[in-house]
Amino acid sequence: MKSFLSDKAKSIEPYTPGEQPKDKNYIKLNTNESPYPPSPYVKKALIESNFDDLRLYPDPNVSDLKKEIAELYNINTNNIFIGNGSDEILAFCFMAFFNRGDKIYYPNITYSFYSVYSSLFDLNEVKIPLKDDFTIDINDYKNLDSGIFIANPNAPTGLLLTLDQLEEIIINNKDNIVIIDEAYIDFAAIESAYKLTKKYDNLLVVQTFSKSRSLAGIRLGFAIGNENLIQGLKNIKYSFNSYTINRLSIIAGIEAIKDNQYFKDTVNKVINTREKTKIKLKELGFNVLDSKSNFIFISHKNIFAEDLYLKLKDKGILVRYFKSDLINNYIRVTIGTDEEMDIFVEKIKYIIKN
């Protein structure tokens, strides 16, 4: 039987999302979701939303949500692009700012969707090795000959570049676009790089509502950059679908931004739990990277990471294991509630002892 698939569809290796098994009630620490529900503002607004309006298309420009983001960050709405999750925006970046066959630079250990997009859009990826401690050497990113993607904090390591380090990369690539993927920036100890977009026209900063604003199920993200870059993203978007953001997502995004105190409180809870968990795991002999995200990246000399992942799964806890040779002795653990992380640590203790 003829397959009807294109060569690309037959050959590409797609992104592998975190597993979501249904066979038992797992403690889910594998997909970097928030352990806390969305803001009560979001719940109230969705319940009270006009059901009849769902017969109407949403605003293709997402103007009301843009206004909220612009006010929060003290920027112009013309400098904002909103997408159906930051992953969609990242995909649009690969299409808007690169031609087929172009080089594209990013770390050899980072968000694996970058490699998928490079393959999908026929770009030549150049993976720059991290240092032995998994940190980025910014000197490796100076005076390159094409665009750069940097996740900050990086994934799955959780390690962070400072704003000064990022600015040095941007300054030394004036003819290349630099895209900073800030999916986890709200859990870090530094400000977002968005302020640098006012100084540098080659910088685009991408963020998401999925992590720190507890809206992974809504699929909402945004980018900040100069009007030329934003227009490029719009050109790609409107060539696919004018209405990528649905009415309920817009409502949820607006209310999540309005409730800034809830946002701060839940982020601080995650940070506090993360730091407490780091200490406990170090006491158990784990190598714990200094993650500034809502997850930690850990290994132990006495147990192979895949075995630890499988034993935790058997005990009802899901974590993320990567088969890549460079990181196959580490697991990534999403930060849950204090109660969930206490259970995680107790299960870890049992596994190590036995």
Curated annotation (Swiss-Prot):
PROSITE patterns according to UniProt: AA_TRANSFER_CLASS_2
Location of N6-(pyridoxal phosphate)lysine modifications: 211
Residue numbers spanned by region Disordered: 1-33
GO biological process, one term: L-histidine biosynthetic process
Taxonomic superkingdom: Bacteria
Compositionally skewed regions (Basic and acidic residues) per UniProt: 1-11
Catalytic activity: L-histidinol phosphate + 2-oxoglutarate = 3-(imidazol-4-yl)-2-oxopropyl phosphate + L-glutamate
One Gene Ontology term of the molecular function aspect: histidinol-phosphate transaminase activity
Family: Belongs to the class-II pyridoxal-phosphate-dependent aminotransferase family. Histidinol-phosphate aminotransferase subfamily.
The protein, known as: Histidinol-phosphate aminotransferase
Organism of origin: Brachyspira hyodysenteriae (strain ATCC 49526 / WA1)
